[in-house]
From Swiss-Prot:
Keywords: ATP-binding, Isoprene biosynthesis, Kinase, Nucleotide-binding, Transferase. This is 4-diphosphocytidyl-2-C-methyl-D-erythritol kinase. It comes from Geotalea uraniireducens (strain Rf4). Gene3D superfamilies: 3.30.230.10, GHMP kinase, C-terminal domain. ATP binds at P95, V96, A97, A98, G99, L100, G101, G102, G103, S104, S105. Its EC number is 2.7.1.148. It comes from the Bacteria.
Length: 280
């Protein structure tokens, strides 16, 4: 095998509770995380020159060691002791710094792809152990299930939900720094005793749990986030929420036709990035 081609899916957070700040500077979280079929395309090929090379061609996405995909490949080569060359080409379809986990998904997908390409035989559990050192969301994309994520996001429990659910994603072309959002978050009520269901049999069940503690911070700086939430509801979403630290907002719809109609309406009324997607 000389190369592999893979899809790196985005995610949305149906729920994001920030429980407390930890002594190590991270936060304990409780999230419901869901993969969607908006994907980056990744090709990993063996090269005659040792080392890792990443090409992307998207403004704001580094090609070298600052790219999580580069660090993922380098980590596996170091751990496995394999002295080979890898060329990684990433076609970005997921908006950058948008709360959709695009970077983490790229890193996770490269871990799985290099493992396959080189026949390393690492289990998903081992790849998740490696991945969490690259980013807190990386293990989720290796887990490959809708998940309740706890701790810093690395403690994962499978959640049963209806599939597929159709969503409309709207991004107002704003890059939001996750670090800035957490630095400006003011923790208030404790939520440890809140019960989050592990089964969602209909779309109304999902809409009932939509909540994101980071929304108020991001909306305070970018009021357009609130505007997008309201417009999604006006075009028929049963619920709308900012994903992650933003700036992407998603709305849930009863079926594909409703989602596509809403996406067409919002795209015609704005210059935002708008797309209808379904859950995986």
């Amino acid at each position: 095998m000389k190369k592999v081609k893979l899809k790196a899916p985005a995610k949305v957070n149906y729920r994001l509770d920030v429980l407390r700040r930890r002594p190590d500077g991270y936060h304990d979280l409780r999230m419901i995380m869901q993969r969607i079929d908006l994907c980056d395309d990744i090709e990993i090929a063996l090269s005659g020159t040792r080392g890792v090379r990443v090409t992307c061609g998207r403004d704001g996405v580094p090609d070298g060691p600052d790219n999580i995909a580069w660090r993922a490949a380098d980590a596996l080569l170091t751990i496995s002791g394999r002295a080979v060359g890898l060329d990684i080409a990433i076609t970005k379809n997921i908006p950058v710094a948008a709360g959709l986990g695009g970077g983490s998904s790229d890193g996770a997908t490269v871990l799985m792809g290099v493992n396959e390409l080189l026949g390393l035989g690492f289990s998903d559990e081992r790849l998740m152990e490696i991945g969490v050192k690259l980013g807190a969301d990386v293990p989720f994309f290796i887990f490959k299930k809708t998940a309740l994520a706890e701790g810093i996001g690395d403690k994962l429990t499978a959640v049963e939900t209806i599939s597929p659910v159709w969503l409309v994603l709207v991004n107002p072309h704003l890059h939001v720094s996750t670090g800035w959002v957490y630095q400006n978050l003011r923790l208030t009520a404790m939520k440890d005793d809140d019960i989050i269901p592990r089964f969602y049999g209909k779309i109304e069940d999902v809409c009932a749990i939509l909540a994101n503690d980071l929304e108020s911070v991001t909306i305070g700086r970018f009021p357009v986030i609130q505007e997008i939430k309201e417009r999604l509801l006006r075009v028929g979403a049963c619920g709308s929420l900012m994903s992650g630290s933003g700036s992407t907002v998603f709305g849930l719809f009863k079926d594909e036709a409703a989602a596509r109609r809403a996406a067409e309406t919002l795209a015609a009324e704005s210059n935002w990035f708008v797309v209808a997607v379904k859950t995986l």
